[in-house]
Amino acid sequence: MVKLTMEPVTRIEGHAKITVHLDDAGNVEDTRLHVMEFRGFEKFLQGRPIEEAPRIVPRICGICDVQHHLAAAKAVDACFGFEPDDVLPAAYKMREIMNWGSYMHSHGLHFYFLAAPDFIAGKDRKTRNVFQIIKDAPDVALQAIELRKNALEIVRATGGRPIHPTSSTPGGISTELDDETQKDLLQKAQRNVELAEATLELAVPIFEENIDLVNSLGNIETYHTGLVKNGVWDVYDGIVRIKDKEGNLFREFKPADYADTIAEHVKPYSWLKFPYIKDLGYPDGVYRVSPLSRLNVADKMPDAAPKAQDYFKEFQDKFGYAQQTLLYHWARLIEVLACAECAADALEGDLSGEKFPDSLERQAGDGVGIVEAPRGTLTHHYTCDENGLITKANIVVATIQNNPAMEMGIQKVAQDYIKPGVEVDDKIFNLMEMVIRAYDPCLSCATHTIDSQMRLATLEVYDSEGDLVKRI
């Protein structure tokens, strides 16, 4: 038996490894994605006042911190008796603007710095990184920095600070925008519309040049899940829509009912669980949450985003109900444009209304908040007692939900490229990494130590008893 190990997986947020298990004939027997980090944030929340949750949970991550903040805020709203539409309109809109700003920042980071090197910087490992992009196309690098800077300024103004926001309160928000700040943010959002269009003009031809790879690499057929509001793409509020493998409507449910639909499978080699649709069982019920999933389940883009709607229609006309993993990148860039347009539209409006309820009253019981994080659907579920203290917390992040699909995708790559007598090199492992990168997994939810002996690629050979006999 031979086990091939890639450690760490590069250009993702966090650390993971891939192991490929070969039988005695050299055929792929199994492929695994190992995530051995553990944080246990749910336990940290127990005993804390429920209103503190939105200020605590952003520390789970420095990239999707806004979405943890907002999902927690919506769960807290529910614990105070507020439905999403009960939140004061100006506060609701401010939360949306914060979310759109975070999307532009996160998606921009992923495409330009983590994903683009695979398509722009060549096939040599030494040049396949963001530094080569900076060297070869400094204007593109500056474009990426400007887009993310503008996005973070929007988050700073609405969230109280650019990282780990604190502004959402039960039923409202604590930040205000004066006229000068709102005008400045509007200009930044409008500029990001231009930058998002420029990014699509740059990226779409590159994707089309690599269409054979797009149509073949790590593709699997799964169910897709995402929020919609009256059938329209939405990343802050709505109902959860599930479509089956053929694109037919399978189910729609309210956020509070998520536990009736989703269950979790456990495997011993990873801290990440393997969620699935309860009625279908595992692995038949594997589903994905992602930018691609959101486009797949939506009927259209918001009226405030006509340019994104044009790209969305073109995307649907070309690919229909898309299952290709590498199309995540294309979908991600359409969302950047949509968020920039939506933010600009909102910032042109009146945001001066009341943002904090006149009275608050805690209610013992459960509160569930669901938003769409950049990587997919994010759920925060809290139970609190009559004193308003959290007794139980459950956080279901997008990367956990995509975990089964990521592993299935790298299994397919391994089976397609690793054959008896074929030398396994870093190019094959990079193809597996490309599949994982497409999902933009966020594993960096913990501050952890990296082994100083960690290598970019390791070949481990085991004997028939499973004992390690050689490491190269």
From Swiss-Prot:
Quaternary structure and partners: The F420-non-reducing hydrogenase is composed of three subunits; MvhA, MvhD and MvhG. It forms a complex with the heterodisulfide reductase (hdr).
Cofactor(s) the record lists: Ni(2+)
Gene: mvhA
Pfam families recorded: NiFeSe_Hases (PF00374)
One GO molecular-function entry: nickel cation binding
Binding locations of Ni(2+): C61, C64, C442, C445
Domain of life, per lineage: Archaea
Tagged with keyword DNA-binding: no
Keyword DNA damage: no
Protein name listed in UniProt: F420-non-reducing hydrogenase subunit A
Function description: Part of a complex that provides reducing equivalents for heterodisulfide reductase.
Cross-referenced PANTHER family: COENZYME F420 HYDROGENASE, SUBUNIT ALPHA, F420-NON-REDUCING HYDROGENASE VHU SUBUNIT A
Coiled-coil residue spans: none
EC number assigned by the record: 1.12.99.-
Keywords: Metal-binding, Nickel, Oxidoreductase
Family: Belongs to the [NiFe]/[NiFeSe] hydrogenase large subunit family.
